[in-house]
Amino acid sequence: MAASRLPPATLTLKQFMRRQQVLLLYRKILRAIKQIPSDSDRKYLQDWAREEFKRNKSATEEDTIRMMITQGNMQLKELERTLALAKS
């Protein structure tokens, strides 16, 4: 029997799309954090974001992942609003 080239745990289309949403959110959060003027605050928030995503990396339940994405988007919007107010 020939060995399969697919990895043993191939993602379904739904899982793949959800993973892309999570990665996009992570990148957006890190880009927003780069706009923070204070080095110490920027470092703190970068560490916080990394730890939150690492902590939730093993989540597999669809509803839980959707809820975390929604919360992450709300936190991103709040950060963007705060940065906009700080610049004005």
UniProtKB/Swiss-Prot annotation:
Localization terms from the record: Mitochondrion
GO cellular component: mitochondrion
Biological processes, Gene Ontology terms: mitochondrial respiratory chain complex I assembly
Pfam families xrefs: Complex1_LYR
Family listed: Belongs to the complex I LYR family.
Alphabetized PANTHER family for the sequence: LYR MOTIF-CONTAINING PROTEIN 2
Annotated function: Involved in efficient integration of the N-module into mitochondrial respiratory chain complex I.
Name listed for the protein in its UniProt record: LYR motif-containing protein 2
